[in-house]
């Protein structure tokens, strides 16, 4: 199994990049891409579904092409294509109307939907789930049905009761209100701080993290990563841990080194018998990012779910002072 990075733009995976990569499976997080926070709009979601469906039927000839949302792309093979939709914090949309998941738009059985209760109930609960297309579900039962479930029956029954009663939905609604308040407070304090004129907050409308970009010091990947690390070190000395965007690259690439950063998602090309390969590359799929060759602003992945509201002014002040100190 080969794992290949796929370019992202402001709306998600780039269709032409999918065709060039000649992949069979795209792993994506359309509700809230990590680490950029991009939410894929419905129009791009439909285009991704059309890409997945276009791999099912054999092309009419070697030069065959298909129109996907007005773009001409080659139908590169007759192999089945799938989208793995990792919807890891879809419950926490902070602004705007909810966007339907790929699985809800899929009418051809091309989406493998996966989610977890780690964000809503806590990581210690360790319950996740996957919804397979019917054809794949049958193959899963035939080939892997001997695997025992690692989640105890008591935990499953308790969660089922919690959901059936409506208490789970009420719990998530309360969490969403609480997190929205924390998000608003953090952004307001940072914007009003001494570094506020240099900060831009991107993709804060969904999920439990957003990007804080620093204006005025845009450089190449190495320059931006170096600036990020210096700011992070200053904040760490005072007890605040920042997550520089430059750290999100394939294993083995150091911050600022030639390699991969944050503007891509991941696709795989699979041979028919390479089921085991999925396990070997799982970590790479979750950490996959992009070619780090362009220019970008320094940025930080800002999580806020664990912040208490009374600590936000202090934390924001430390972050602001670290940025100002490096800006000089």
Set out the residue ranges of the language-model regions.
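PLP-dependent class I/II
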Residues: 1-328
């Amino acid at each position: 199994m080969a794992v290949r990075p796929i370019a992202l733009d402001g709306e998600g995976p780039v269709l032409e990049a999918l065709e060039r990569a000649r992949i069979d499976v795209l792993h994506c997080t359309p509700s809230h891409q990590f680490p950029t926070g991009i939410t894929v709009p419905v129009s791009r979601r439909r285009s991704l579904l059309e890409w997945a469906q276009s791999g099912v039927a054999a092309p009419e000839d070697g030069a065959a092409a298909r129109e996907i949302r007005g773009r001409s792309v080659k139908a590169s093979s007759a192999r089945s294509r799938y989208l793995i939709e990792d919807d890891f914090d879809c419950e926490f949309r902070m602004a705007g109307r909810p966007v339907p998941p790929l699985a809800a738009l899929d009418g051809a059985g091309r989406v493998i939907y996966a989610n977890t209760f780690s964000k809503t109930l806590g990581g210690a609960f360790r319950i996740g789930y996957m919804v397979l297309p019917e054809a794949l579900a049958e193959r899963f039962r035939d080939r892997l049905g001997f695997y025992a479930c690692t989640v105890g029956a008591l935990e499953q029954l308790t969660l089922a009761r919690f959901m059936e009663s409506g208490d789970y939905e009420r719990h998530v609604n309360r969490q969403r209100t609480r997190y929205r308040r924390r998000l608003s407070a953090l952004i307001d304090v940072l914007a009003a701080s001494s570094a506020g004129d240099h900060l831009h907050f991107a993709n804060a409308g969904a999920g439990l993290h957003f990007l804080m970009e620093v204006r005025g010091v845009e450089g190449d990947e190495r320059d931006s990563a170096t600036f990020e690390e210096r700011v992070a070190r200053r904040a760490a000395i005072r007890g605040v841990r920042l997550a520089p965007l430059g750290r999100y690259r394939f294993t083995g690439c150091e911050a600022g080194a030639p390699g991969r950063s944050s503007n891509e998602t991941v696709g795989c090309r699979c041979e028919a018998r390479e089921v085991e390969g999925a396990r070997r590359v799982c970590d790479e799929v979750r950490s996959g990012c992009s070619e780090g060759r362009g220019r970008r602003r320094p940025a930080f992945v800002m999580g806020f779910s664990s912040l208490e509201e009374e600590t936000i002014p202090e934390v924001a002040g430390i972050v602001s002072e670290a940025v100002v100190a490096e800006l000089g």
